[in-house]
Amino acid sequence: MLIKNAFVFGEDKTFSKRNIAFSDGLFSDTDCNCSQEQSFDASGLYAIPGLVDIHFHGCMGHDFCDGTPEAIHHLATYEASVGVTSICPATMTVSEENLTQVMQSARTYNEAELPSEEAAFAGINMEGPFISESKKGAQASEHIRRCDSAFFEKLQHTSGGLIKLVDI
């Protein structure tokens, strides 16, 4: 496939009008011998790397802390529709029971066959409960805890190793 006339973000951190060829899952900046049906005129459009969202709680009426694979499906589908290719949704500072449910639902979601129209699930951003009371922002005070490696390990095990970021 050949994408023609796109404004491509380059190594020099500027956009320039270029063609992008790709085949067998690999991109190239050299033209291919593609048929007209295998080319796309991207005049006036920008080609950028896929975006990675490492901190968001929810969207479109769904929240990561809803604790269901279905909620994650809605988050991943929406994020992909706006150019995000990978997500690392953030928890809130919630009860141990709720956090455990969130971790289990993330594991269940991640182990399922995922539709190609969803952003990839890169992991979990655990925003709390190990945060400072003085820097809590919108986090619930009643669920803030001191750092606890045993509790973290329990959650990490429940998630199947998906916790990638921990806010403290």
Where do the language-model regions lie?
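Glycine-rich phosphate-binding loop of ATP-grasp-fold ATP-dependent ligases
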Residues: 134-144
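Di-metal (Zn2+ and/or Mg2+/Mn2+) metal-binding site signature of metallo-dependent hydrolases
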Residues: 45-67
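Histidine-rich, glycine-flanked metal-binding segment
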Residues: 1-4, 8-48
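Short secondary-structure boundary/capping elements
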Residues: 43, 67-71, 144-151
